[in-house]
Amino acid sequence: MLETAVRPRQAIDVAATLNSDMERVWALTQDPAKHARWDVRFGRITPTGEGRFRYRRFGVGGTGEHSGDRWAADGSATSALRFACRNPLSPIERGSGYWRYTPREGGGVTFVTWYDYRSRYPMIDRFFRPLMAWGTAWSFDRLRLWADRDVPPEFSASIALADAAIRAGAVIAAVLMLDGPSRWAAAVALTILAIRVPALPWAPSARRTSWSVGSVR
């Protein structure tokens, strides 16, 4: 069993199904430069030697340590790490987790992550942790688009931004163009529709993955 740096509390669990082979998925996730391109949680990942690295996002940096890989006879693999941040601007104090790669019958890989962390600000974490889970799930689908369809992460993020802008624009237009009670009724209806309509095929979507908060392993 993998060692963890903290006891499970409200761990985050995300799984995505990719059609790419193990070699490609491993390359896109284990290379720090490639990892930073698809994972919205990181702006930059810099190796510092002996399995250690520094990461930065929105001007807040932390450190991490790769704590080992395990390969099973069935071809599956698990990669574990620990991470920490001393910056008081970060809600995350320290944590640990792993990635698991499981080959699928007929081809492809099921890519899973499980991680937990100690929050610096428990009250804020009630909102921050679900956001982290959603961001991880969104990033996993962004990885899928890159691995399976050769859609660069930067391009898929641009498509997602444009998609969100169109949805928001439709709601705003309804508020500005209509009068009376119908204005707000239309705005509510369009907001619900904007949330429910599936994302464009080239835009990442957390809905295409399975994710949860509160997993214990």
Where are these regions (language model features)?
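Terminal "cap-and-tail" regions of soluble proteins that handle hydrophobic small molecules
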Residues: L2-A5, R104-R217
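Terminal, regulation- and interaction-focused segments at domain boundaries
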Residues: L2-R24
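Intrinsic-disorder/low-complexity, polar/charged segments enriched in Ser/Thr/Lys/Arg/Asp/Glu/Gln
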Residues: R9-T17, R94-S96, G108-V112
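Residue-level detector of alpha-helix boundaries and kinks
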Residues: Q10, S20, R86, I124-R129
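Charged, solvent-exposed alpha-helical segments that act as regulatory interaction surfaces
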Residues: V14, W38-R41, L145-P152
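Amphipathic alpha-helical segments
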Residues: L18-D39
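Hydrophobic-ligand binding "helix-grip"
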Residues: A36, V40-P47, G51, R56-G108, ...
